[in-house]
A protein has these predicted regions:
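N-terminal presequence-like segments and the immediate start of the first folded domain
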Residues: 2-79, 85-132
């Protein structure tokens, strides 16, 4: 995203006040939205489209670490992950990187889906929901 800022929206309801924070807001999406103590990350992709799936996975996981840190959270608080792979032959290589990154005993709910991604060079995309 080219725009790096945080926007907040405070909505007063009948019984409570709700805070909605958007991070890195662009024309089409925000990289992260925080609401009611839950962090929602947009699908994260690698910067280097020429890299192999393991390198791209490390880049994506570093982005996730950075974004969660901005919201005051970390990977131990991840609730759910959806991993998108255009080629399921990359499943084992991706899992090796994932297993080295995720804290032992802190694995979240997870699904891995084969899907065509937005650009042909993307070998992995990861979407995360985490506790703040």
């Amino acid at each position: 995203m080219s725009v790096y800022h945080q926007t907040s929206l405070h909505l007063a309801g009948k019984d409570s006040t709700m805070t909605l924070q958007r991070y890195h807001v662009g024309k089409r999406l925000a990289d992260m939205v925080v609401h009611n103590g839950t962090i929602y990350l947009a699908g994260q992709v690698a910067d280097d489209l020429s890299a192999d799936v393991a390198t791209q996975a490390r880049q994506v996981l570093a982005n996730i670490d950075r974004l969660l840190g901005e919201a005051g959270s970390d990977k131990a608080k991840i609730l759910s992950v959806t991993i998108y792979l255009p080629d399921m032959n990359d499943f084992e290589a991706m899992n090796a990187v994932w297993e080295a990154w995720v804290p032992a005993g802190q694995t979240p709910a997870r699904a891995t889906v084969q899907a065509k991604l937005a650009a042909s060079g993307y070998k992995i995309e990861i979407q995360v929901i985490a506790a703040a």
